[in-house]
Structure formats: C-alpha cells, structure tokens
C-alpha cells in the first residue's frame, strides 16, 4: 500500500510512503482489539478504593442491649453493618485491576487497529519537521493545513522531538506521541492519525 507524503502545508511532496501490508492491510481481529483496549483501560484504574468493615470501625464492642426480653431483634456491637455508622459488608478493598496479555496478541491488536484506520482513509504521512521553539500557534497552523484542526488527531513522531511535543500540549483535540507509545486504544480513539515519515520504519519493524 502506498500513500502520498505531505509537507507541513498540506501539499504533496511528490513522494510516496510504502505502508507494509502485513501491518496496515491485515484482516482485523476484533477480539484481540477488544482484549488490548480492555487491558489498557484496566491499567488506568487506580484501584485505591477502600471501605471499612466492622472489624475496622472505631467504637465499642460492648453488647448494646441484653439478648432476651426486650421484644426487639437481638443486637451485638454498634459496629454491626445494620446500624448507621457501622462497617460495610464485603466492602471494596485496594486491588490491581491490570492483567497480562502475550506480546503476539498485543501486536495483532495494534496491526488490526492500524488496518481499520487505513481502510477508513484516516491515516496521513507527512515529512519530518520540528520547531526552533515550542509554540502552540505553529503546531495549530500545521493541523489547519492538514485539515484536522477540529478533529481528534494522533501525531506519531519517529524520534523524540521536544519542541513539537511541547507545542501540542495545550490542545485538547490532538495528542503527540513517539512510535514506542503507540497503543491500540490511542489508534482507535483518534479520528485522524498522522505519521511523520521517520516513524514508519520503527513501527513496521516492531509490528512485522
């Protein structure tokens, strides 16, 4: 698969970037995509929730009233879950929601997501660029030239480019990442994906 390489003004450079069919044109595996996205979202959960059970509540353990003869239900400690301020029954405890997936499945999921976006014509390739100083205005002009300033976009860099990254941090609709940070969730969450020309080789070698 070949795609025209654009410059930062949105015009064709006359060059074509070759996208590997083994990465950008496979039959998507929906279940692999589902598992990888599920793992990504699970890993975002902090899992710090905690409720005190009756043994952890501060208070007296004396019996509230005598066992028999009151005509009402028997009752023990004030920390019982049936009373206001009592402990929680089977309350949430801190836990790690993350789970593991093997590398081959994660690789398949990423290739499936890229193939979906390629099939939807949602992928662009532009020549490598950088800024002398971080400036949001410069980055916004690039997005406007590409026609994606109002779309949720993902820009994938080949090498770490600090000024480009800093120029994008103030924008809600775009995210700049390095090729090593590319994930199935981020691919699917973006309406448009822009690859810098230098990022393709690293992505294809990692996923092939």
UniProtKB/Swiss-Prot annotation:
Function according to Swiss-Prot or TrEMBL: One of the primary rRNA binding proteins, this protein initially binds near the 5'-end of the 23S rRNA. It is important during the early stages of 50S assembly. It makes multiple contacts with different domains of the 23S rRNA in the assembled 50S subunit and ribosome. Forms part of the polypeptide exit tunnel.
Official protein name in the record: Large ribosomal subunit protein uL4
Chain segments annotated as coiled-coil in the UniProt record: none
Keyword rRNA-binding on entry: yes
Gene giving rise to this polypeptide: rplD
Oligomeric form and interacting partners: Part of the 50S ribosomal subunit.
Pfam families assigned: Ribosomal_L4
Source taxon at top rank: Bacteria
Segments of this protein annotated with the region Disordered: 45-77
GO cellular component annotations of the record: ribonucleoprotein complex; ribosome
Phylogenetic placement of the source organism: Bacteria, Pseudomonadati, Bacteroidota, Flavobacteriia, Flavobacteriales
GO biological process: one example: translation
SUPFAM superfamilies listed in its UniProt record: Ribosomal protein L4 (SSF52166)
Family recorded in the similarity comment: Belongs to the universal ribosomal protein uL4 family.
S-S bridge residues: none
GO molecular function, one term: rRNA binding
Record's keyword terms, sorted: Ribonucleoprotein, Ribosomal protein, RNA-binding, rRNA-binding
Gene3D superfamilies: 3.40.1370.10
InterPro entries assigned to the protein according to its UniProt record, in alphabetical order: Ribosomal_uL4, Ribosomal_uL4-like, Ribosomal_uL4_dom_sf
């Amino acid at each position: 698969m070949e795609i025209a390489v654009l410059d930062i003004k949105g015009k064709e450079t006359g060059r074509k970037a070759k996208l590997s069919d083994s990465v950008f044109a496979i039959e998507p595996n929906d279940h692999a995509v589902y598992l990888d996205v599920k793992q990504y979202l699970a890993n975002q959960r902090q899992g710090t929730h905690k409720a005190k059970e009756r043994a952890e509540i501060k208070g007296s353990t004396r019996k509230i009233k005598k066992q028999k003869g009151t005509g009402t239900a028997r009752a023990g400690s004030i920390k019982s879950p049936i009373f206001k301020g009592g402990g929680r029954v089977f309350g949430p405890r801190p836990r790690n929601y993350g789970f593991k997936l093997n590398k081959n499945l994660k690789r398949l999921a990423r290739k499936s997501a890229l193939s979906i976006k390629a099939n939807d014509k949602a992928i662009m390739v532009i020549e490598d660029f950088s800024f002398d100083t971080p400036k949001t205005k410069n980055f916004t002009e690039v997005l406007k030239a590409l026609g994606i300033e109002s779309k949720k976009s993902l820009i994938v860099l080949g090498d770490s480019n600090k000024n480009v990254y800093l120029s994008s941090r103030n924008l809600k609709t775009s995210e700049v990442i390095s090729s090593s940070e590319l994930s199935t969730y981020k691919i699917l969450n973006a309406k448009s994906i822009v690859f810098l020309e230098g990022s393709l080789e690293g992505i294809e070698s990692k996923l092939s």
